Each structure stands twice: as structure tokens, then as C-alpha cells.
Amino acid sequence: GNDQIETLLMRMGNGTGVKGLQGIHEIRGCIVRPLLHFSRKEIAAFVKANNIQFINDISNEDDSIKRNAIRHQVIPNWEQINPNLNIAFGKMHDYSKENDELVRYAVKLVSKKLVQLDSYGNKKILKEDFDVLPILLRMNVVHEIIGETHLSWRRFQYEGLKKFLIQSRTGQSLSLPMNWRILRDRNNFLLRKDQEVQKLSHKVQPADITDCGNFYFAWEWVNDFSYSENTQWMETIDGGEIKNQNLEIRRWKPGDSFVPFGMKNHKKVSDYLIDSKVNNFSKENQFVLTADNNIIWLCGYRISDRVKVTSKTMDFAKISITQKKLNEEKY
């Protein structure tokens, strides 16, 4: 009733969007408002007819408070012009709710088509198809991904995301509510929820599986070697080159370098990642495998030329990484 009108007028004065025009929800979670559709006059008449005692909060008489000013000065005068004001605002609430349902339906369809999960567990939106959509739909897809469809964003958060989706350049990122971040990559938008920083380094042992937080690292001795078995996350190396050395898998750091397989000279890890067009999210989580502090594998990209298999190799070691999120999370 009047509470709904007051709320809607306040929101309209603040420049609310379509979703804000839904006003107060009659039912939200465990909260139920059974008197929402009754006007102030109807409630006052019911109280008087049934001789119900009530307490009047004197702060409700203070017109310096915005809601009180609307209640005492705006609504009574407006009702002189339109006695059915309560019904009219009720219809606006219903229309806004129907429009929101339409948007949410479209968001579900778009998300199913355009949102994928990359090999690192990031949510990936295909940029070429995403950029042609209306900005309101794009913003709601982001809301859907981070699970904030029922929460209101503050104005600066809303405007910040809108500006980012329209104007951002490759490599730029934006912090979002609930510890999420969005990154504009070359061909995609990537979204990731920042977790607690996992341990930076892990000691590994031959013929063992090591839990490295977001992934497992495995080492096993094998009897032979085939190039066809190698993948992005699995390599076979000359195990004899690193026998009795201290093995460690850790995050890469500035200054790291190695001799990539097939090359003769050292190359900085940072340069290799740039040349490979690796996005910033992936760079932050890039690990290397070292033997006595020398990099022998830029995990997921290239082994060191030092540990390549040759005709003289006697001991074959298969090293691999299994991303936990590939098995545990789906969009």
C-alpha cells in the first residue's frame, strides 16, 4: 500500500532501474508482508473499527526525514488527483516484476550459450558474441555468474561494471562484489572468484602424487616414451638428468628463466608467457617445476631442453598436473 508507494517514490528520486521499480517484495525468503497491499487509510479504518491499541512513533512526524515528507506532503496531494494511486503503483510493481522475469529468462539462455569454463576453472564469456548484446543483458549475465541475482549493487559498483564492459582494454580487470574479479582478455571476458592464496611452493618426490591446492602434481617412472602421449599437462622427461636432486613445484617469480625445449639460450618466463598470449589470471597462477632451483618445466607450456628425451635416455619420468576444478566445478 502506502509503504510501497513511499519506497517506489524514494527509489525513483534516486534514479533506480527497472528492477528497483518492483519496490518491496511481499515474500522474500522467510520474510512475509501480508499487509503490503493495504493502503494507510484502510489500515487506519480497520484499527479504529476494531478498537486496536497502537503506539505512535513520534519520529514518524518528522518531515525532515525523506520518507515522512513523501508520506505527509506528496502522497495526500497526489491522491487528491488520483484516488487510485495505490492501485496504479501496484500495477507498476507487477509490470516491473514481469520485465525482470523476462530479463532473467534471457540471461539464462545467453549464459548457457556463451559462458564456458576454461582449464583453470575461470568462467569464460565469448567476447565477440557478448559485445553485441544490450548492455543491461551483459551486466545481468555477470550478476548471474557471480551469484548475485537477488542482491542490490551500490551505484558505484553498477556504473563501474557498465563502464568496464563498454570501455575496458585487453589486460584490464575490475574487482566485483563477493571477491570476484573480471578480466578483459583478447577474445574473452574471464571471471574468477579470488580464493585464499594457496601455498606458493611444494616439495615433490619421484613416484608420488602431491596435493598442490588447486591441482595435483604426479610423477611416475615409465619404461618407454612416445611423443604422442605428451599433452599440455603431461610430459615425459629424461629422469636421469634430475636424479638425487631437490624437486619443487612453485609459482613463477620475476627474473625466472629457463632454456625452452628446442632452444639453446635462456628465455625469461615472463617473456615466454607474453609471447604465448597468456592472460593475467593465468599468469598469477602459473607454476614451474624446479630441480635444485633450476626450472625444468614451465607447467602446461614447455619443458626445459635440459631434460628432453634423447637416444641416450635410460630413465623415463612422466610428470603431469591434474586441475581439481576440471573435475569439481561445472557452470
What is each of the regions a protein language model found here?
Residues 2-92, 96, 111-112, 119-130:
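Catalytic subdomain that performs nucleotidyl-dependent activation
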Residues 26-28, 90-331:
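AMP-forming adenylation/ATP pyrophosphatase catalytic core
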